[in-house]
Amino acid sequence: MPELPEVETIKETLKLFVCNKTIKHIDIEWPNMIKHPDDVEEFKALVTGQTIRSMGRKGKFLLFYLDEYVLISHLRMEGKYSVHSPGDPVKKHTHVTFYFSNGEELRYNDVRKFGTMHVYPIGEEFMHKPLNQLGPDPFDTSFNLEYFYEKLKRTDRYIKTALLDQSIVTGLGNIYVDETLFRANVHPLKRCSKLSKQEVKKLQINAKETLRDAIKAGGTTIRSYVNTQGDMGMFQQDLYVYGQHSKPCRVCGADIIKIKVGGRGTHLCPTCQPNKQGVR
């Protein structure tokens, strides 16, 4: 699933191609993707004739700011946007096409068909699902140490599980949680209530640094992620633990191990991230 750095990269590349383009009409081949309004014809009517004025992002969600509305798009597992000229071959699994008045087309392709789209009036986008259920973005000023520490100390969950909770902080997924925990020298099975304020500060700082580094590298391509121009991310070359099972740690040389935390595959260095609680 594209996480914050991948969605940020997609947002920035989309800005180059879709801003100030007017949507002439829309084809929707998989209506189940349209979540609000749930009537596809109403969805089309709201968006048709609107010009894309700017692009935004909240966590893993793309935000298309139109004249009067905001189109909220979640790529889920395999969703991809690409811009095409008229007559370009249409790939299999292209489920939504936005036709611009200049003849260009913005196509949404999704092998798994898990992606979602919502439309709300500008100013109401954070009042409804899905955005109203999200915690702060890691780059929001509201994601400060006091907020983060208060949230974590109130729960006895494993820190790995808490960092994946989008209501605490939004945008982190399995890749960047594992990398953040490694950089902060925190074991994924440590209970949140047992974290010191200094450990929480290290998590906050390293989450931001990890995400910034990944954004600079264009995201991480593990399986199929590419940006709007079809370019792969490069951050997979800089991963310390994720996907590095049995390889030597780049910091200490110990073998990276893989465990399960809350049903999620989790990578760590047992030396750099000691399990001081002895939890299995």
Curated annotation (Swiss-Prot):
Highest taxon listed in the record's lineage: Bacteria
Alphabetical keyword list: DNA damage, DNA repair, DNA-binding, Glycosidase, Hydrolase, Lyase, Metal-binding, Multifunctional enzyme, Zinc, Zinc-finger
List of residues binding DNA: 93, 112
Residues the record marks as active site: 2-3, 60, 264
Biological process according to GO: base-excision repair
GO molecular function: 8-oxo-7,8-dihydroguanine DNA N-glycosylase activity; class I DNA-(apurinic or apyrimidinic site) endonuclease activity; damaged DNA binding; zinc ion binding
Cofactor note: Binds 1 zinc ion per subunit.
Gene3D superfamilies noted in UniProt: 1.10.8.50, MutM-like, N-terminal
Cofactor: Zn(2+)
Catalytic activity: Hydrolysis of DNA containing ring-opened 7-methylguanine residues, releasing 2,6-diamino-4-hydroxy-5-(N-methyl)formamidopyrimidine; 2'-deoxyribonucleotide-(2'-deoxyribose 5'-phosphate)-2'-deoxyribonucleotide-DNA = a 3'-end 2'-deoxyribonucleotide-(2,3-dehydro-2,3-deoxyribose 5'-phosphate)-DNA + a 5'-end 5'-phospho-2'-deoxyribonucleoside-DNA + H(+)
E.C. number: 3.2.2.23, 4.2.99.18
Residue intervals of every FPG-type zinc finger in the record: 240-274
Coiled-coil annotated spans: none
InterPro entries attached to this UniProt entry: DNA_glyclase/AP_lyase_DNA-bd (IPR015886), DNA_glyclase_Znf_dom_DNA_BS (IPR015887), Formamido-pyr_DNA_Glyclase (IPR020629), FPG_cat (IPR012319), MutM-like_N-ter (IPR035937), Ribosomal_uS13-like_H2TH (IPR010979), Znf_DNA_glyclase/AP_lyase (IPR000214), Znf_FPG/IleRS (IPR010663)
Annotated family: Belongs to the FPG family.
Subunit structure of this chain's protein: Monomer.
Protein's job: Involved in base excision repair of DNA damaged by oxidation or by mutagenic agents. Acts as a DNA glycosylase that recognizes and removes damaged bases. Has a preference for oxidized purines, such as 7,8-dihydro-8-oxoguanine (8-oxoG). Has AP (apurinic/apyrimidinic) lyase activity and introduces nicks in the DNA strand. Cleaves the DNA backbone by beta-delta elimination to generate a single-strand break at the site of the removed base with both 3'- and 5'-phosphates.
Full protein name: Formamidopyrimidine-DNA glycosylase
Originating gene: mutM
